[in-house]
């Protein structure tokens, strides 16, 4: 499902995936900065009820928190692509109403939708084959630099490698750690 989405909206396959271009140009959604969204509500962003815009915390968008910004956009794209039917009968015009909309859902459903959003975002921004290639490149570079006892089962080694790989995808090392575990490159 993610691969089909990426091929449709990012057919070049170039890394990093320009998720802002997909949201703004390919899908024509507005990206609206909201001051203090995270501080007031504990969220980085949300999709408008009419699916015309992604609202995102001003600090995330404007203050160079690039990785969070990109991941938040990808996460909201997941809700648009996977959970569009949820919004068919949704009616919220404020963050408070959006929060009430979410709270009205059973906790198990809400958790499942959020998990799907995180998984979709990670797969969109860090494609499986490209991740494998970048991990192999990182291991090779480490060996060439004399770090021959690199062990991705050691958390510190894995985390350093994940930070390096993450920079290639414009995502955090944490995203790479999760994606790498999901794809079997190391234990969870």
Model-derived features with residue positions:
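Active-site hotspot residues in diverse enzymes, especially metal/ion-binding acidic/histidine motifs
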Residues: 1-188
